[in-house]
From Swiss-Prot:
Annotated site location: Part of a proton relay during catalysis: T44, Y107
Principal location listed in the UniProt entry: cytoplasm
Source species taxonomy: Bacteria, Pseudomonadati, Pseudomonadota, Gammaproteobacteria, Cellvibrionales
Complex and partners: Homotetramer; dimer of dimers.
Identification of the protein by name: 4-hydroxy-tetrahydrodipicolinate synthase
EC number, as in UniProt: 4.3.3.7
Superkingdom field: Bacteria
Gene Ontology terms describing biological process: diaminopimelate biosynthetic process; lysine biosynthetic process via diaminopimelate
Gene name as annotated: dapA
Length: 291
């Protein structure tokens, strides 16, 4: 079952941008030891936009092999071309993932009907559980609650990652969505309140550096121990902020390198974290006892 803390895993790279398979395997094992409930490979945080198709599928297969059935693996397979999204989703299914995460088409700004037809066609083409992903800050299009509700009744579409931070949407969607439709937060700051409102967990950037704390926070929120969950979230507040001082995953990759978990490699057009932010990220990690 998809629930709890689902890390939006980075894709480790060497300084020259080549993929670091050893670091990837170690990161996966660390997350399993720390209590992460599911792993999302090659999403936004995994730099899917700068991986070619061969690399994209290779990373998915590497994560699936390393996890070896211990927790669910979700693959980012969204694209702004419907046919490409179908191709990636089928390849991810063939690679053994448990579900796919499909970001709303970006840059070409489809209408709500276009969003519906895009996801409907992918769902009809590949028989695997699929999560919608609404992140208008990156895609320039907002998948409205009524569109999400329509899609909830389409076979193979099982949930949505909602990254607007708008808690009111949880109730709006759950009221009319198909029974059992999963609402997953895509915003670390508001995840506790999102879960308390009826969400099943979060896909987290902060979990890259604080897997145990984020897993505990999600579990407490799911148990209704909201104040205890909020206390953990307060401890992580500066980390949440630090992870977005520059475009994700720039800060989180620097943080993981600082923690000694991987090199600080990243691909253009993204660049390593500006030196002016190093101290702020380091202080946030230390304040949360992550360093």
């Amino acid at each position: 079952m998809l629930r709890g803390s689902m890390v939006a895993l980075v894709t480790p790279m060497q300084a020259d941008g080549s993929l670091d398979w050893e670091a990837l395997h170690k990161l996966v094992d660390w997350h399993l030891q720390e209590g992460t409930d599911a792993i999302v490979a090659v999403g936004t945080t995994g730099e899917s936009a700068t991986l070619d198709v061969k690399e994209h599928i290779a990373v998915i297969r590497a994560v699936v092999d390393q996890v070896n059935g211990r927790v669910p693996v979700i693959a980012g397979t969204g694209a702004n071309s419907t046919s490409e999204a179908i191709e990636l989703t089928q390849a991810a299914k063939d690679g053994g993932v448990d579900a796919c995460l499909l970001v709303a088409p970006y840059y070409n700004k489809p209408t709500q009907e276009g969003l519906f037809l895009h996801h409907q066609k992918i769902a009809a083409s590949v028989a695997i559980p699929q999560l919608l992903y609404n992140v208008p800050g990156r895609t320039a299009v907002d998948m409205l609650p009524e569109t999400i509700v329509r899609l909830s009744h389409v076979d193979n579409i099982v949930g949505v990652k909602e990254a607007t931070g708008d808690i009111a949407r949880v109730g709006q969607i759950l009221e009319s969505a198909k029974a059992g439709f999963l609402l997953i937060s895509g915003d670390d700051d508001t995840a506790v309140d999102f879960i308390a409102a009826g969400g099943v967990g979060e896909i987290s950037v902060t979990a890259n550096v604080a897997p145990k704390l984020v897993a505990q926070m999600c579990e407490l929120a799911a148990q209704g121990k909201v104040e205890e969950a909020r206390a953990i979230n307060a401890r992580l507040a500066d980390v949440h902020t630090a992870m977005f001082l520059e475009s994700n995953p720039i800060p989180v990759k620097w943080a993981l390198a600082k923690m000694g978990l991987m090199p600080n490699g990243i691909r253009l057009p993204l660049t390593p974290l500006d030196a002016k932010y190093h101290l702020q990220v380091e202080q946030a990690l230390r304040a949360a006892n992550l360093l």
